[in-house]
Amino acid sequence: MQEGKISQIIGPVVDVDFPEGRLPSILDALTVKREDGSKLVLETQQHLGEERVRTVAMESTDGLVRGMGVVNTGAAIQVPVGAEVLGRMLNVVGDPIDGRGPVNSKKTYSIHRSAPKFEDISTKAEMFETGIKVIDLLEPYSRGGKTGLFGGAGVGKTVLIMELINNIAKQQSGFSVFAGVGERTREGNDLWHEMMESGVIDKTALVFGQMNEPPGARQRVALTGLSIAEYFRDEENRDVLLFVDNIFRFTQAGSEVSALLGRMPSAVGYQPTLATEMGQLQDRIVSTKKGSVTSVQAIYVPADDLTDPAPATAFTHLDATTVLSRSIAELGIYPAVDPLDSTSRILDPNVVGDDHYNTAQAVKQLLQRYKDLQDIIAILGMDELSDEDKLVVSRARKVQRFLSQPFFVAEAFTGLAGKYVKLEDTIKGFKEIIAGKHDKLPENAFYLVGTIEEAIEKAKTL
């Protein structure tokens, strides 16, 4: 064991002196024993000359003093993996934080691993159903693909990701890993209790490094969750679901650490290594010929600006994007997905079939035409439109409302029972609205319902 001594502490960044020629390697984990007997983990980030390393702490550095002994573990941070982590809640270094005793796993993985080789990566395209109409119809998610949920503050990213966990984890028998990166502790607590109640906790591993943690933990916790998912993919050949909330906080933590490590900031004050860090994380989230990792990542958009370097860098790695819009949330339509801004690589007749593809395109054309007419309506009013355009507006408003849906995880707030809508019911409903079968029904009949049959029933009560 190589012993070093702390020489300087600047917030979450700690400098450690080692004897000459015994410097730890970059990314090696070092441990410091605190006075209360607990261990603090540091990760080596830079070599400063022959005898000093600069490290980032994975927990608060309160109580550390110069001269304290530091032990080099000789390896990167190792976290427990395997069946033993299911149903447990861990922190960035793999210690349990659920108060249910130690995790007795037989195997550990390093949080830093190389991405699979190109020849091992699977390229097949196949859709998986989420039960959420707007997603299944307009930006279908691919099995083994990467999906991003983009949105500003308070438009419903976390609620949507919770609903996806609820729908997918219940419908599919696979394992899920949830990484809470720099988000609200309250939401993590709610998720834990909801999973306990719904019974999906036994198939889920939860890893948290929330807002109150130092940047080192927030920067690395996504990698911890990913290593757990990789074990199930590579060693047990399973299809795994990986949920990350929020990938922006990963970038934000990197930017906090970057300045303290003495790097020059790049565009908008982000770290110069932004694209590399994002690439190293995203390149590991892939499906191989053995098993798949299907990932859903919430991505916060600072000030609703999609061109900000953090969300813009994430865009390039994704197969499908679900963009949440404040203007749609203001209309009271939830999930507040922007149907014209959201995209999917597999919305292709060869993958989803002609019926699905044609219906989706017809819905988009109708909504785009309505968007184009909105300026005319705002200036001249509805009366100036031709009869054909009035019909477009009426159907588009029905489609817009039919894209909303009550969520299981929001039952306590809406008072409405959640709905899971099968893909064929979704396609059938939108086809009928576009064909004009329901022109006589009031708009409100389509708001916050599941299938088209429910809309017809609701119309009878209005």
From Swiss-Prot:
The keyword Hydrolase does not apply. It catalyses: ATP + H2O + 4 H(+)(in) = ADP + phosphate + 5 H(+)(out). It comes from the Bacteria. Keywords: ATP synthesis, ATP-binding, Cell inner membrane, Cell membrane, CF(1), Hydrogen ion transport, Ion transport, Membrane, Nucleotide-binding, Translocase, Transport. It comes from Chlorobium chlorochromatii (strain CaD3). Produces ATP from ADP in the presence of a proton gradient across the membrane. The catalytic sites are hosted primarily by the beta subunits. CDD domains: ATP-synt_F1_beta_C, ATP-synt_F1_beta_N, F1-ATPase_beta_CD. PROSITE patterns: ATPASE_ALPHA_BETA (PS00152). GO terms for molecular function: ATP binding; ATP hydrolysis activity; proton-transporting ATP synthase activity, rotational mechanism. ATP binds at G151, G152, A153, G154, V155, G156, K157, T158. It is a peripheral membrane protein. This is ATP synthase subunit beta. The lineage of its organism: Bacteria, Pseudomonadati, Chlorobiota, Chlorobiia, Chlorobiales. GO terms for cellular component: plasma membrane; proton-transporting ATP synthase complex. Its main location: membrane. It is found in: Cell inner membrane. Belongs to the ATPase alpha/beta chains family. NCBIfam families: atpD (TIGR01039). Its EC number is 7.1.2.2. SUPFAM superfamilies: C-terminal domain of alpha and beta subunits of F1 ATP synthase (SSF47917), N-terminal domain of alpha and beta subunits of F1 ATP synthase (SSF50615), P-loop containing nucleoside triphosphate hydrolases (SSF52540). F-type ATPases have 2 components, CF(1) - the catalytic core - and CF(0) - the membrane proton channel. CF(1) has five subunits: alpha(3), beta(3), gamma(1), delta(1), epsilon(1). CF(0) has four main subunits: a(1), b(1), b'(1) and c(9-12).
